[in-house]
Amino acid sequence: VLDFFPDLLPSPPCANMEKLTVRHMLCMGTGQEEEPDIRQTREWRKNFLASYIPHEPGSLFHYNSMATYMLSAVVQKVTGQRVLDYLRPRLFEPLGIDAPDLHWEQSPEGIDCGGWGLFLRTEDIAKMGQFLLQKGEWEGKQLLMPDWIQKAGSAQIDNSLNAGWLDWYQGYGYQFWMCSQEGVFRGDGAKGQYCVVMPKQDMVVAMTAGLSNMNLNLEAIWDCLLPGVQDEALCDEEAEQAVLKKLQSLQIPLVKGEKAGPSVALWNNHTYAVGENAMGIDRLSFAMEENGVVL
């Protein structure tokens, strides 16, 4: 990894940092016991490269979103493009993921955050899962090598020491978690954003949620959905139509009320000074817009 950023290296770098590879970061095997807080300054890459790695890379699993940020930085360094812009013609557009609000949060360095901050619709997540299920093929075109998807969706590092729920210590691939159900793997995000790929069942489940207990989502799939899966298609047209009608009726109504209360005048278009802090932020401003608030 150091070879990609020779101008950002500390002197001297940590010995284990010198051994760190892209593969180690893909499978969360940096050798770090904690995710380094690289966001203390605006130079995230430099802070990561200066962080300490106590264990041999590849010997210890620890979930590390900052490592995924560095993967994004590597892609930008090699291609000269943001990950979002690199993927648009190669992945997003072929899959029909072309929402005008497709967005990826960036660091102060102008690099897509990688490990978080990608805004997608639930339908887009489902398309990504179907793409993985089809081993990188979409509408007759092979967009990604099947061998890569096979490796990404298979255990590349042991995470059995990872405390917590059952589905969090079944192994980890290239940015994908292995699940307790045979052959199933998933991408997941904070508070229950899921893309669950089930090759044996030829099925994908996409979820967006806001839960503190992310395990509830998976338990619902294992306990309620999988037992009802059959190899044959529904032969009862009336039952099929009933299912479709039920699905179309499931929605969360919009919250009623005004977009902003009377207190908006107290903070809208105001700037506030901020005391000394680790993030180096010295002021904040708020601006009310049509669809939300800009900070």
Q: Model segments located where?
A:
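N-terminal glycine/threonine-rich, aromatic-flanked beta-hairpin/loop signature
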Residues: 277-295
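Active-site Gly/Thr loop motif
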Residues: 99-101, 150-207
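Active-site helix/loop module of the DD-peptidase/beta-lactamase fold
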Residues: 1-28, 50, 79-115
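Active-site-proximal binding-pocket segments
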Residues: 94-153
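Conserved catalytic neighborhood of penicillin-recognizing serine enzymes
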Residues: 9-35, 56-57, 66-67, 120-123
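Alpha-helical scaffold elements that line and support the substrate/ligand-binding pocket
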Residues: 25, 62-92, 96, 124-135, ...
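Flexible glycine/proline-enriched surface loops and loop-helix/loop-strand junctions
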Residues: 52-57, 67-69, 106-114, 180-184
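Short, gly/Ser/Thr-rich active-site loops of penicillin-recognizing serine hydrolases
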Residues: 215-282
